[in-house]
Amino acid sequence: MQYNFDEIIDRRGTDCFKWDALQAMYGRGDVTPMWVADMDFRSPDFVMEAIRHRCDHEVLGYTMPSEGYWQAVTMWLEKHYNIQATKQELHFIPGIVAGIAYALLCLTQPGDRVLVTTPVYPPFLNLPKDSGRTLVCSPLRITNGRFEIDFDDFERKAEHCKVFIMSNPHNPAGTVWGTEVLTKIADICEKHNVLVISDEIHADLTLPGHQHVSYGTVSSKGITFMAPSKTFNIAGLGSSVCYIADEALRKRFFGWLDALGVAGGNIFAFTAAEAAFAQGGEWLQQMLEYLSENVKTLDRFLQERMPKVKVVLPEASYLAWLDFSGYGLTHEQLKHKLLNEAKVALNDGTTFGGDKYECCFRLNLGCPRSILIDALSRIADAINE
């Protein structure tokens, strides 16, 4: 079956955060949203069919994950993550941000230091502070157009931390951390008794030519979170999975989750995830090929129309990191041009790690190519004016 990712679907009026929160978040609703990290593609037909079939029963009582669900999850992890997990090593989580918050509350104490590498997904900056922990940032370097970890700085700071929250692949920009990098992280963190929490929500979206390596295959001493939400565009269903190989850590954290009643999810989270993992291979392959062409389109466009923009192109997922500092504009001038002249809503780089990133913006290219090209054209016209 050939899937149509060029189809334009009007998401407005569905309480869609990406489109319907524009007025509240940006002060105007007449802009193209290229911010929130979900895609504007139709959710797969086999997922929608499974949900409709479950609805047809017309009794939506308390539910539990079926054996079919666990089988689909474990088979997917083995095929795509090279993780041979037992059901006992896995735990359902209603969302990865919530899962990380649970881990911090369960496994650390108020005041403990939590390490992140910036720029990074904004909740990683907020979770430690909001839970009474101390945030520690190790800035990434950009070398040859991709993010790299400054391991000298990383180890100096890790020595005094209890937890490292890692985005693997990295958000923003979808940098894929290879085996060598992950092994070095594991060595440093085990040396200093730092727990690694690996958010791998973008892992399935690793683009052709790159290979995702799960932290769970490098070390048994960490917590790995995965989800079908980004992969199959079903983030609104709240479905993710936690994997822990180490028995002592697993018993402590999973026992805490069970005490909170976290094991239960909504009916459609289980139904959709099972269908996605069991039937989603071909859809995912075609979608990744489409995203890869979107990345190439962005790269060509920037070279031709906005050569002063420095970009970190995604190796996984659909999020690019754009640095407009070459235009000599202030943060406020850039925001005005992008929002009010180009009429495009991007993620402000300062939310990923502070004023150091005031000329940077994250762009979501998980959309039909015609929308991407139109938005880029308007950005170029505004910036080059």
Segments predicted by a language model, with ranges:
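N-terminal small-domain helix-loop-helix segment of the aminotransferase-like
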Residues: 2-95, 102, 276-277, 385
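Conserved PLP-anchoring active-site segment centered on the Schiff-base-forming lysine
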Residues: 106-128
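Helix C-cap/helix->beta junction micro-motif
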Residues: 131, 191-192, 342
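Active-site phosphate-binding strand-loop segment of PLP-dependent enzymes
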Residues: 140-210
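Active-site PLP attachment segment
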Residues: 217-252, 265, 359
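Structural signature of PLP-dependent enzymes
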Residues: 251-257, 276-299
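Conserved glycine-rich beta-strand-loop-beta hairpin in the small C-terminal domain of fold type I
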Residues: 274, 290-299, 311-324
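PLP-dependent enzyme catalytic core of the Aspartate aminotransferase-like
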Residues: 337-346, 352-385
